Amino acid sequence: CYIQNCPRGGKRSYPDTAVPQCIPCGP
């Protein structure tokens, strides 16, 4: 999981919740 810079088709981290979730990153 990547936090800020997400490669094409990569994932981004969501530290907003108790358990960090990974969401798809991209257009």
From Swiss-Prot:
Disulfide bonds join 1-6. It comes from the Eukaryota. GO terms for cellular component: extracellular region. The modification Glycine amide is found at residue 9. Belongs to the vasopressin/oxytocin family. Vasotocin is an antidiuretic hormone. This is Vasotocin-neurophysin VT.
